[in-house]
Every structure is written in structure tokens, then in C-alpha cells.
Amino acid sequence: MADGEKIIKINIEEGKSSGIKHLNIVGAKAFEQRELLDIIELKHPSLTSFYKNDDKYAREKLSGDLETIEAFYKDQGYADFDIESTQVSITPDRQQVYISIAIDEGDTYTVSDVNLVGELGDVKPEDLRNLIIVQEGQIFSQALITATEERLTTALGNGGFTFATASGVPRLNDDGTADIEFFVDAGKRAYVRRITFTGNQVTQDEVMRRES
């Protein structure tokens, strides 16, 4: 080691994940708290926690659980469900945490009207309407709206509209009904201008294109 040089050793000791002392969901009325706790990843300590490790707090898990709770409610008709606040407090010994999630369930909604609007290109509107799985009289479900969006964009993509978009937008009415409008933008149809094969040393490009 040359004069003036020093060796510096840095030891990094990662802190242990805090265990969950108590997890509470405030504002749940339509569903029992036990039912909501069953669908999320974070758990109270149990006999199986020592190998599942599901009673350890992690910010990423909490964020995912908040999304899970919201999706659960919005698939059960609660279109205006909202998570009002989330509080995480740690015990004095920094070994455990208390988690409190405050929610506003809102009201349940029933689908009253479904419309398809936007730029459809040369696609017949009825062909796209047949792909809509959200129907009048159904309990509002965000999952069905998302699935319809995927069906519409997939169908348009298969028809050459590679950059097509579809967005289902609910309008909530005071009478407990929801109007759903699917806004579609087919965009421009994409065409294949040329197919080039690489690596073939025997068959000519023209023959391969003709056979494909």
C-alpha cells in the first residue's frame, strides 16, 4: 500500500423488517373486516407467519394491498369508493407497527346506459358493440370495464389499428345508476411495407415471402 493511502471498511447492517402488531380497516360497513383482511397480503401474526413471513411490514405490500381493497370494492358496485387515509405508527422499541386504513365505501351503483363513441375508423360500430361485456342492469364493476377496454383494443389491433385506444368512463348519477361511455380512438391503420428475411442461404427472399 503506497504512502498516504488508507483502507476504509464500511459495514452496513440492514434493519429487520418490523412485525405487524395490529392492522385495522376503519369505515368498513358492507363487508366484515375479516373478509377484507383475507384478501390482502399483509397479515396479523399467526401460527403460519414464521414460514409465510406475511406479518412483516413492507411499504410495497401496503401499496399493493390498498389497490387490492379498492379493486375489490369497485368490482362490487362501489364506484365512488375512496381510501381516505393510511397511518403507520411504530412501537417505541421499533420492532412492530400499527397500521390503520380509513376508507369511505360510498354507494353501490347499477349500470343504466352503455355507449360507444369516438373515432372507429372503418370498423362497423356493431362489431365493436358486440365485444362490450358491460350490460345495462349489471352491478357496476371496474373489472368488466377494464376487460372490455382490452377486448376493444385487441380487436382493433387485429384489424390493423396497432395504436388503437379504448377507455371506459363512468358517469355516476344521483339515483344510484352509472352511465358508461367507451371512448375509442382507432387511429391510423398500419400496413406492412416490406418483409426481409435474414439468415437464409438457400431459399430466395421472393419465394419465402410468397409462401408466408
Where are these regions (language model features)?
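Interaction-mediating elements
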Residues: 1-212
